[in-house]
């Protein structure tokens, strides 16, 4: 990802490209929290500290220089809560907030057909999606593949299809029940996510909102 980011910045003509290691901060946080975490196995908590450190670092630069942080979340991730609150959800604006992951790939491929040379590195498009919080991590270890996930999300969110209707349309029942549950449970994260471009008829935060607590179900 570091090399892909550097190449993308070069292709976009970004001169002030910076790499700021988070390892010292991560080590300091682990040391600070060690007494409180004593006797507990390492888990997602320690992984998410990395994302939150990146978010804190970006917001510090924003604060110091008056820049706005662009959030990288897309609608698929935002829908199911596949994001770290106060980590990769930080930012003042989210360009891809209302764009499903499969459409993001389509946009990348389209963008690379415009102009004299491709802008987005092929590695960004070709490599398996990953939060990169642990070695060999892939999104499809936690979620259905995006070509399976997105049609379920579109049916549930854009077309208000019920669980029985989604299953009747040929989607796997376990996937449907799991995905719709994730969507409902992630409302509290979406309420705290940055504003962004509205692309669909059911943009989160404006056109589609659920209660934060899920006792209504």
Language-model features, listed with the residues they occupy:
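ATP/NTP-dependent adenylation/nucleotidyl-transfer catalytic domains that generate, transfer
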Residues: 1-217
């Amino acid at each position: 990802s570091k090399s892909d980011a550097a190449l993308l910045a070069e292709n976009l003509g970004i001169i002030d490209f910076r790499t700021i290691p988070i390892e010292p901060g991560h080590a300091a946080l682990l040391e600070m929290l060690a007494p409180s975490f004593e006797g507990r196995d390492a888990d997602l908590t320690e992984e998410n500290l990395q994302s939150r450190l990146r978010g804190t670092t970006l917001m510090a630069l924003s604060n110091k220089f008056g820049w706005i942080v662009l959030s990288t979340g897309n609608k698929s991730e935002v829908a199911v809560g596949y994001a770290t609150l106060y980590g990769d959800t930080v930012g003042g604006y989210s360009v891809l907030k209302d764009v499903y992951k499969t459409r993001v790939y389509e946009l990348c491929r389209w963008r690379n057909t415009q102009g004299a040379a491709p802008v987005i590195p092929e590695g960004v498009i070709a490599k398996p999606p990953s939060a990169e919080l642990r070695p060999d991590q892939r999104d499809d270890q936690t979620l259905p593949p995006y070509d399976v996930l997105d049609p379920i999300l579109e049916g549930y969110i854009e077309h208000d299809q019920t669980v029985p209707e989604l299953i009747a349309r040929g989607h796997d029942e376990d996937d449907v029940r799991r995905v719709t549950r994730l969507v409902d449970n992630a409302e509290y994260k979406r309420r705290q996510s940055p504003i962004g471009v509205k692309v669909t008829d059911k943009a989160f935060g404006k056109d589609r909102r659920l209660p934060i607590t899920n006792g209504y179900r």
